[in-house]
């Protein structure tokens, strides 16, 4: 009796294990006949068959891994030290299914926008911050229920196949009967009576339709309001602070672009073939600015108003202004003094592409010791840029236009560009500013100055 009980238990465990290993749907299954064989160590045990009449029925439940149904809370990512808070703009709503790394919301800070992706596949259960609400680093944003599988993409509905039966061909219509040939001339029609006319005195003038009001013809005059985004608010605040803090002064000069245009036209194909980059004018001005900043380090310095000290930087990080739909951003090219033209062009292209795609990180815009703004790409002729604090100067580039200039006692038409240097007159004197701008002019007009370190 003991051996039979053990064999039954062993066989039942094996059957149950086999059922559990199979990925069976929810249901009820009955064990078929279970054969119990004589096992070793039990010589007295006999073979026994348990029929289906014996109730060995097991109900199976399909289970899911615990991690698939976990509810997690996603928090605001940490910001840079110079950023304390941001505004939330939701891309998804409650109940939306999201895939891993799919953007759920965007946090707009003073300098850039930070995208918050979903950490896993799941369904959004709750939004913990309203749209447009302010959040700090580590603030809970939303809760997500993991599903373990990416949401299936909706397939386009297929048009139902309709069986069309060929319509039976209609019998051919009989030919029309032949019209009889006329044997007599048709009668000549008599002229009709002219229509009766009214006398002029009987005609009464009709009133002209009233003229439409002048206001209705021009349309309604309306206006609407939009909330300033955080980046625009920060730009306005910083520029006003710069005006209130710095004693800004602007000096001008003009640059003959003939040599740099000739150099670009001669070497642009070889430059593109070797570096896979287009050779532009921006790299020439960035390189010339680094050369001039090394000659005039005070332009690369800044006043620390808290300690009343002048901070001289031994490195050159140049901010390049880039216009985006959200506003003006200034990504930084670091250690420009160690770069060549190809390195500068590559960095400008990478930062510009990230700015247009709104993928700039805060670290890409932190720092900067000098700024270059190129209004010439929009056709600017002249302008005075505003200092980007905490810097002490900014260079403004403008459009290239053919103008008559005196060259060797003769009038020639040359491609000319106006350049402007706005600087903090509290730190930089006029002599240093003019010398700095002339260094840039010399390096751009004749790039050999950079090679010879003149």
Curated annotation (Swiss-Prot):
- Cofactor binding summary note: Binds 1 lipoyl cofactor covalently.
Into which EC class is this enzyme placed? transferase
Q: Which residues form the Lipoyl-binding domain?
A: 71-145
Q: Which cofactor does it need?
A: (R)-lipoate
Q: Which residues carry this modification: Phosphoserine?
A: 82
Q: Where is the active site?
A: 425, 429
Q: Name one GO molecular function term.
A: heat shock protein binding
Spell out the InterPro entries in the cross-references. Answer: 2-oxoA_DH_lipoyl-BS (IPR003016), 2-oxoacid_dehydrogenase (IPR050537), 2-oxoacid_DH_actylTfrase (IPR001078), Biotin_lipoyl (IPR000089), CAT-like_dom_sf (IPR023213), Single_hybrid_motif (IPR011053), SucB (IPR006255)
Which cellular compartments is it found in? Answer: Mitochondrion matrix; Nucleus
Annotated EC: 2.3.1.61
SUPFAM superfamilies cross-referenced by the UniProt entry? CoA-dependent acyltransferases, Single hybrid motif
One GO biological-process annotation of the entry reads:
NADH metabolic process
Q: What span is annotated as transit peptide? A: 1-68
Positions bearing N6-acetyllysine: 155, 268, 273-274, 278, 308
Function of the molecule: Dihydrolipoamide succinyltransferase (E2) component of the 2-oxoglutarate dehydrogenase complex. The 2-oxoglutarate dehydrogenase complex catalyzes the overall conversion of 2-oxoglutarate to succinyl-CoA and CO(2). The 2-oxoglutarate dehydrogenase complex is mainly active in the mitochondrion. A fraction of the 2-oxoglutarate dehydrogenase complex also localizes in the nucleus and is required for lysine succinylation of histones: associates with KAT2A on chromatin and provides succinyl-CoA to histone succinyltransferase KAT2A.
Q: Which NCBIfam families does this UniProt record tie to the protein? A: sucB
Full protein name: Dihydrolipoyllysine-residue succinyltransferase component of 2-oxoglutarate dehydrogenase complex, mitochondrial
| Protein species of origin | Rattus norvegicus
Gene (name only): Dlst
